[in-house]
Curated annotation (Swiss-Prot):
Binding site for ATP: G15, P16, M17, F18, S19, G20, K21, S22, D89, E90, I91, Q92
Organism placement in taxonomy: Bacteria, Bacillati, Mycoplasmatota, Mycoplasmoidales, Metamycoplasmataceae
Similarity comment: family membership: Belongs to the thymidine kinase family.
Subunit field text: Homotetramer.
Keywords for this protein: ATP-binding, Cytoplasm, DNA synthesis, Kinase, Metal-binding, Nucleotide-binding, Transferase, Zinc
Protein name: Thymidine kinase
One Pfam family matching this protein: TK
GO biological process, alphabetically ordered: DNA biosynthetic process; thymidine metabolic process
Organism: Mesomycoplasma hyopneumoniae (strain 7448)
Gene Ontology molecular functions: ATP binding; thymidine kinase activity; zinc ion binding
Catalytic residue list: E90
Amino acid sequence: MYKKFFDGVIEVITGPMFSGKSDELIKRIKILTYADIKTLVIKPSVDYRFSQCEIVSRSGLKIPTFLARTTQEIRDLFTRDNYQAIAIDEIQFFDEEIVTFLEQIADKGIRVIVSGLDQDFRRKPFGSLPNLMAIAENVTKLQAVCSLCKRAATTTARKVLNEAQTLIGDQDEYEARCRACHSL
């Protein structure tokens, strides 16, 4: 029933913006670091909000990271060293090829931990994350607080007029909403 720590596994951390996904990812990376498990940490190069060289959470936690634009760049970084784990923040910004790559390395005994949005601002599946959730051994779905009614928020609402699915932003562009308060 339980896997050994070094059995390959895929873990997904998801939820709306402002739910603590990066905090949870950094916490799990630090546990691996304490255990001397060599971990490749990645974030997409398009995520420039807080730092170009670190994953930074809104609570102030931070951890050094490599930047990548494509799955091929991640693959190249991964093969440069003898990594035992890989952690990727904002996974929804990578191409669909990432699902196959992460499944392949998990099958070889690598621990995979990813975080990101599973829904876009329209509450539609976002990027590769829903497909990763389908094959993951562990899915943690976090909640935020609805900016309007203060109930549990499970969605991210866009506050600015822009129809593009991807718009990098923060509190000026987005807020967490519950199902009842989320209007398109």
